[in-house]
Amino acid sequence: MDQKTKEIVNNIMNYVIGKGASDEIKKNQHSVTKTLSLSADNLCLESIENDLWQHILDRIKCFNRDELLFLAEFMRESFSARLYPVALLYQFATINDIGIYISKIVLGNELLFNNRSCMDLPKLKYLIDCIIFYDNVKTKIEYTKRNTLSVTIDDIFEPVKNEVVDNFFQGYALYLNSIKVEDMEISNPKLRQYLTDIHLTPDEIYKQANPVIEDIVGFNYDDVDYLLYKVPYMMLNTTYSSDRENRFHIKIMRNDFIGYFKDYISEEHLINVLKYLSINHCLNDGKHNNREVELRCITENDGVLSFAVRTIVECLGIFKRITITGHYMDEVTYSYQKSKLELHSTDLIKQQQSMSTYFSYVVAELFESYGYLIAKDANGYPDVDIKDIIVNGSRLVFNDIDVLAFDRNTNTIINCELKYYKVKMDYAGMTKDALNKEKYESLFKRETTLKNNKSAIVKVVFGLTIPDSSIEVKSIVVTSRQNYNTKNITEYNFEEFKRKLLNNETL
């Protein structure tokens, strides 16, 4: 990449995150208004969306195809490296979203590009503002009822006015930075060995899942682990780096990429990895959703692969996290893999259940570490996923208490429900009200049974003799990840839960 292109890319990055760009944004908004012949009022959002998309396609043809793809990679790479983690100051899109849009438009449409053109900063800024505007209009149509109403020129460029949107990125940062179940550790050596013996640690669960995921996508988690370790070394050793100073972006012949790893991963598996990561392959298979494209990061042209090192590492890491629980398998798999996906549907459910059970052991150990009594099995290990308890010769059916604990300071039985949420990949997933009242019916039934048998349960499970009148029952939900669901019960994400225990706060 020459010096002029570098300067333009840096200028674009600063522009995207809002540094001194307000006047130019207003100028470009005025140009869009004029080009699309938008009147002062009675504007239809869906009509604007269609017209603007066509306008973007017309504008993007004026650029050099490879330079656009490089810019898209650079944006996504910078977001992966958290060099530019900031959302646009006045918009909903991020540099990651803009990079995905550009890749999708360039590779997913039969366009005749002006490949002899040079990067033009004002034209690029205008194109990006059009993409931002398009994303904003789509957001309004999808997440508000405004698409059934007319809007004015002054209003059309404003982002969605919603408290959830205002707080989205602050909460999303907490979500991204929170520890994942796959990374949670058991500190008790005896319990850790027990879980290893029964194949219930994340490492063991991944080992068991290897043949399942390999049969579905054609490569396995061992391959992913090796690539996660080895790919960063490519920017130090390959002679195909597109920019020796930057070292983040690599152009390499497809056969050379395969040759770089084939001593450790079979050629067949490597070919399938490249198919999975290829944006071209994704679009050709009919996957055009931004979130589906986001899972991929390699662009192909005449046998040459182009990608950003940090982004390929992030995409592989995301693949490993979301597939172990069977989440987003429709987005991960291609059309020709659907039969294998259906064949292994039960296996994927078992993997999720195993990871959820491991989560129960982690939470139970935390309770005990901070002075709570916990239900234990005959061998002295935490008794999780409790189905029933025998009290005075009678069997009390609970079906599934994830963790049962007792606070000796307040004489409170803690009925703990765990939610192992799938990774949320977009705004809709983060804000969807998935936890309706019915989701808690079983939890409330268990709570009622506990309240009706308080002293007997405390005696049988925790070995304490305390009268009913002195015992309270509290139900809480601990989620593996941050979420924005409407709550009708006390709920903590895992980080909040740990902090509560650490500070000896009442749950």
In which residue ranges do the predicted regions lie?
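Catalytic cores of nucleic-acid endonucleases
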Residues: Y420-T479
